[in-house]
Each structure stands twice: as C-alpha cells, then as structure tokens.
Amino acid sequence: GTLPASRSMIRALLTFWKFTRPHTIIGSALSVTALYVLVLAQPGGVPAHAQVWLPSLLAALACNVFITGLNQWSDVEVDRINKPWLPIPAGLLSRSVALTIVLMSLMVALLVAAWVSTFLFGLIALISVLGWAYSMPPIRFKRHHFGAALAITVVRGLLVNLGFYAHYMQQLHGHLTLDPIIGPLTGFVALFSIGIAWFKDIPDTKGDAEYHFGTLAVRMGRGSALVLGAVVVVLAYLAIIIPALVGLLPYPAWYTLSFGLPLIAFVTMAARLEV
C-alpha cells in the first residue's frame, strides 16, 4: 500500500543523500551562496533576484554530485576496506544506478549552466573535467598526494572562488571588479584545501596502501600527515589574520575574530587527536 511505498521512497532518498557525500554538498552550497551575497553587497548592481543565484547553485550542486559520485563509482574495491558504509560497497546502490546518477548530474549541471551563461558553462565544464581527471585513469590525480592536493586546491580554492565571483559580478554588475577581500579569501581556501586533501586520507591508509595509492598518510605515516596538514591549515588562518591585525588589510574586527575563533578551536582539537 501507500506506507511501504513511502518507506521505499524515503530509503531511496536517504541513499541518494549519502551518495552525494553531504559534507561536500553543504560546503559547495555555502561557498556559492556566500560569494553571491558578497557580490550583491557591492553598490551599483541590479536588484537581488533568485534568477542568478538559484540556477547557479543548482549547477554547482549537480556538478558536485557528479564529481563525488564518480569518485565512489571508480573506487568501490578500495571503499569496501576504507568506507564500507558508503551506498555502493554497503549494497544499497548498484554501480549501474550510481553511474546513471553520475551522468544525469553532469547533464543537469552543464544544461543549467549553459542556460545561465556561456561563462558559467565553461566554468562548470572545466571543474567537471578536473573532477573526472581526479578519479579516472589514465590521470587519476587521487593516486598521488601532490596531484590530489593540487586538483582539490585548484577547484575549491581557485575555480569556485574566483570563477563564481566573476560570474556573479558579470550577471549583477555587468563588469568584473575584484573586491579586496577576494584575494585573501582565495589564498585562505587554497591553503586550507591542501590541508583537507591530506587530512581526508588519514583514516583510509589500509585500503590506500593495499591498492597502491600514494597518499601522504601512506607515504609518511598518519601522524606526519596530521602534523603537516595542521601546519598548513594554521598558516592559512595566520596569513589572513595577521595582515588584518597590523592594518595591512581593511577588515573590521568582527571579520578577523571570525577567523581567529575557528583557528583556536582547530588547534585545540588537533592537539587532542591520536592517530
């Protein structure tokens, strides 16, 4: 009856949600939205309307599902060891259905981006190509810690920040003028992404070593990867906090504080970790 069908639908939606890797979806949504608000706050633009933000967000999220889904689809055997709870190794999702979701997500991302603007289409296409190169042979950046960190940094640090900022500026203001905050923010996210690229492999050393993935945690040990990643993340925070404190950057006190508090929390948690 209706109840079993409803339960099946809920299970399917939950499986899809897990397949999207929710933390990446949330991160992408926050980045794309924050950049929109930043551009919107600049004087002289057109009035706020969802016609720019919503389709841009949809294209970004669909592209995110394509990249994370392709990563899982290409890594089933490794994930049986490292992440057996993910939908494919857990038997909740077949590889064929997963591939269908991946390809449909790519199609949605490109079609929506093309509808919005040629620039956004090119941006989403470039991000998708790098996402493919991250997971798929012959390039497969993720097999080597430098390639993985470089790919993640280019996408998260440069293309998303600078690309979506330029896209919104063109749509809302008709020209590209860089806000002074964009450079430091892009540098921060780029450095932060390097640390994250090293951190995320720390729990996965067993499967990565067995399948010859040259991650930093496999090559140098989990403890060294944690320390190096922590150093890079702390440097990212300090690089944006110190110039503001000495007056080199025109940030208000609350802005500097908004970076300082997470830094304190991060250092505190990192000091307690045992790997």
Regions found by a protein language model. Name each.
Residues 2-275:
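Multi-pass alpha-helical membrane architecture of UbiA-family
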